[in-house]
From Swiss-Prot:
This is Elongation factor G. The gene is fusA. Residues 6-281 form the tr-type G domain. CDD domains: EF-G, EFG_III, EFG_mtEFG1_IV, EFG_mtEFG_C, EFG_mtEFG_II. GO terms for molecular function: GTP binding; GTPase activity; translation elongation factor activity. GO terms for biological process: ribosome disassembly. It is found in: Cytoplasm. InterPro entries: EF-G-like_DII, EFG_II, EFG_III, EFG_III/V, EFG_IV, EFG_V, EFG_V-like, G_TR_CS.
């Protein structure tokens, strides 16, 4: 494996469903010599889409990680899913990438899911460039897409290519850095292309865009700016250097175009990945906590530092068993060595180490900073854990995982299925942190929870195919939550005397809504529950305090209104008392649970429901009906905008009202309208609706 860090690119390819992400990745693998035959998504043969459900549905569910080479550089590509139910996969990949290519559909432009993925990439400060795909399709409009990148994403596009010809006459691109045309030969599957003079009818436009490009890049370097302003020629080398600098600092985002399906534009895209996206060295450091001191700091990304790596994905491979994908941030690791999982504080022995190509694998003996490899047979490591050198323990930044918004009951069909189902669900939950399972206390049913109907459908499908479990499925239910709306204080004493050792614990706790908490720490802003101890003078000994937190964490899973998990509140332990003999961690855990049960009703608790951001694209003539229907679903229409000859309606609608919406929309618009939705936030349920929900529980 190439050991020079500057020769590695860890990139993700992310976009909206159907923008042509997997096809683009397929072409990259083909031209870099990793696959001998181009896999077509709509034939169900794409190399990256290797789970059966993916090949059938033509969508990518799990980000396959694969390695290829271009211009002596090692490119590790993570292909991410574009369907909104799988945003967790995207979030995980972005965390371990150094750069990304955002693929846009040249016809549809910036779609809702593209926005979601873009915001996620902003969160992790991932430098990226844009590839406007499908330039050969009817209605493709490169310039409109560039405007949408500006308007919808609030990003600064740097156009470095222009399309030559439109729709079926799309022939190639104008390279604004070299100021030449790149034209592909159709008969060579796009493997052959040549640089030519820019066509006459494009010269004026190319000059105009070249001037814009120079205006934007010279701002990054005073010397080159002086040279440019005094009328001297800026060299190709200098332009490339500045584009790289601006891309890495996110001053702008280079925009390229092509048609991956028609094999045009992929090689210049690869050149741009190598020229402009960062290597691990450009990122320089990774945030983490030093275990010995508890101090948060930036650790250098370097081969000479002690070993550290982040596990970002777990996959079950039919031949190797469980595979844990890791991104190595520092140092190196060889098979046979032992490292420590610092989150679980457990040792892990490194057995087989594999370099993955979609679902083929190559054994390697060592991996070092910058590499992405899969480890076989780790016992205790789950997604988001850190593996580190035993002598210098670090915990790298954890990933935030969203709360599931939809749930269904599953019942195994037979006794044999029942035994297999437990194993299947625990394996699937280990792979996917946005998928949870629980047992309903009252009915004893197994409940599975996820990010959307498609997400759960695929989980059930995998249970059937991979684990041979047959199950009956209930109707989807909304994952409601509860919260409090005002602060309350509770002083509770737990006492139990019954022969032998007694139990004693007193706790005084303030519960308050998170929105009322002043000076929230940065790392607490995305949490749904915060616990803090303000005990002074040992009123509750240090070793008992984790018992209080554990008790609250367990009990908040069943709230006080209708038994839904309680979120968005802070619990502060302010006082308490203990007994030398009768107190224990367990006694404090019980006291905390009872304090919760007694205190929460005083906090004016309310029921919350998931609100989805819905976007409907409909022809003008159905607009009134669509809006009327959204209003009848307790929707709040936020606005409309024309897109081509259709209207885009944006609204916030409770998830509870969106089940079966696809059929209603189809009949309202004679099948011509389409919609997409993403979870946006939790909001209070109106009183009369809340009463109905409580009555059902």
């Amino acid at each position: 494996m190439s050991k020079k860090l500057e020769n590695i690119r860890n990139i993700g390819i992310c976009a909206h469903i159907d923008a042509g992400k997997t096809t683009t990745t397929e072409r990259i693998l083909y031209y870099t010599g990793k696959s001998h035959k181009i896999g077509e998504v709509h034939e169900g043969g794409a190399t990256m889409d290797w789970m059966e459900q993916e090949q059938e549905r033509g969508i990518t569910i799990t980000s396959a990680a694969t390695t290829c080479r271009w211009q002596d550089k090692q490119i590790n590509i993570i292909d991410t899913p574009g369907h909104v139910d799988f945003t967790i996969e995207v979030e995980r990949s972005l965390r371990v990438l150094d750069g990304a290519v955002a693929v846009f559909d040249g016809v549809a432009g910036v779609e809702p899911q593209s926005e979601t993925v873009w915001r996620q990439a902003d969160k992790y400060n991932v430098p990226r460039m844009c590839f406007v795909n499908k330039m050969d399709r009817m209605g493709a409009d490169f310039y409109r897409c560039v405007d949408m990148i500006k308007d919808r994403l609030g990003a600064k596009p740097l156009v470095i290519q222009l399309p030559i010809g439109i729709e079926e006459n799309f022939k190639g691109v104008v390279d604004l850095v070299k100021m030449q045309a790149v034209v592909w030969k159709d008969e060579s599957l796009g493997a052959e292309y040549s640089y030519q003079e820019i066509p006459d009818d494009m010269k004026a436009k190319a000059e105009e865009y070249r001037a814009n490009l120079l205006d934007m890049v010279v701002e990054l370097d005073d010397k080159i700016m002086e040279k440019y302003l005094s009328g001297e020629e800026v060299t190709e080398e200098e332009i490339k250097k500045l584009i790289r600098k601006g891309t890495i600092s996110a001053a702008f985002y280079p925009v390229l175009c092509g048609s991956a399906f028609k094999n045009k534009g992929v090689q210049p895209l690869l050149d741009a990945v190598v020229d402009y996206l960062p290597s691990p060295i450009d990122i320089a450091t990774v945030k983490g906590v030093e275990v010995s001191t508890g101090e948060e700091k930036d650790f250098p990304i370097s081969v000479s530092e002690p070993f550290s790596a982040l596990a970002f994905k777990i996959m079950n491979d039919p031949f190797v068993g469980s595979l844990t994908f890791i991104r190595v941030y520092s140092g190196k690791i060889t098979s046979g060595t032992t490292v420590i999982n610092t989150v679980k504080n457990k040792r892990e022995k490194i057995g087989r180490m594999l370099l993955m190509h979609a679902n083929n694998r190559e054994d390697v003996k060592e991996a070092s900073a910058g590499d992405i490899v899969a480890l076989a047979g780790l016992k205790d490591t789950t997604t988001g854990d850190t593996l580190s050198d035993e002598d210098k323990k670090v915990i790298l930044e954890r990933m935030e995982f969203p709360e599931p918004v939809i749930e269904l009951a599953v019942e195994p069909k037979s006794k044999v299925d029942q035994e297999k189902m437990g194993l299947a669900l625990s394996r699937l939950a280990a792979e996917d942190p946005s998928f949870r399972t629980s047992t309903d206390q009252e009915t004893g049913q197994t409940v599975i929870k996820g990010m959307g109907e498609l997400h759960l459908e695929i989980i059930i499908d995998r249970m059937r195919r991979e684990f041979k479990v047959e199950a009956n499925i209930g109707a989807p239910q909304v994952a409601y939550r509860e919260t409090i709306t005002k602060a309350c204080e509770i002083d509770y004493t737990h006492k139990k005397q019954s022969g032998g050792a007694g139990q004693f614990a007193r706790v005084k706790i303030i519960f308050e809504p998170l929105k009322d908490v002043k000076d929230l720490k940065e790392e607490d802003k995305n949490k749904s529950f915060i616990f803090e101890s303000k005990i002074v003078g040992g009123a509750v000994p240090k070793e008992y305090i984790p018992g209080v937190e554990k008790g609250l964490n367990n009990i908040r899973e069943t709230g006080v209104i209708a038994g839904y998990p309680m979120i968005d509140f802070k619990a502060t332990l302010i006082d308490g008392a203990f007994h030398d003999v009768d107190s224990s961690v367990l006694a404090f855990e019980i006291a905390a649970k009872a304090a919760f049960r007694e205190g929460m009703p005083k906090g004016n608790p309310k029921l919350l429901e998931p609100i989805m951001k819905v976007e409907v694209i409909t022809p003008d003539e159905y607009m009134g009906d669509v809006i009327g229907d959204l209003n009848s679903r307790r929707g709040q229409v936020q606005g409309m905008e024309p897109r081509g000859n259709a209207q885009v309606i944006k609204a916030y609608v409770p998830l509870a009202e969106m089940f079966g919406y696809v059929n209603t929309l189809r009949s309202l618009s004679q099948g011509r309208a389409q919609y997409s939705m993403v979870f946006n936030h939790y909001d209070q349920v109106p009183t009369q609706v809340a009463d109905t929900i409580k009555a059902k529980k």
